[in-house]
Amino acid sequence: MAKGKDVRAIVILECTSCVRNGVNKESPGISRYITQRNRHNTPNRLELRKFCPYCYKHTIHGEIKK
């Protein structure tokens, strides 16, 4: 039997450099990834280096609230 309910949470990662620069004419949008994290192992907000197709480079993507 499962010990707890909803241990794995679905989170959305958003590009921090796109958000900081704002959506302007140069950038057509904001890069977002959907992933899961284990609440017991990572209680803090998740930050990963992912590729941003709008910045054309690897940037830090941080967890946002739903």
Swiss-Prot record:
It is found in: Plastid, Chloroplast. One of its GO terms (cellular component) is chloroplast. Its main location: plastid. One of its GO terms (molecular function) is structural constituent of ribosome. Keywords: Chloroplast, Plastid, Ribonucleoprotein, Ribosomal protein. One of its GO terms (biological process) is translation. InterPro entries: Ribosomal_bL33 (IPR001705), Ribosomal_bL33_CS (IPR018264), Ribosomal_bL33_sf (IPR038584), Ribosomal_zn-bd (IPR011332). NCBIfam families: PRK00504.1, PRK00595.1, rpmG_bact. Belongs to the bacterial ribosomal protein bL33 family. This is Large ribosomal subunit protein bL33c. The gene is rpl33.
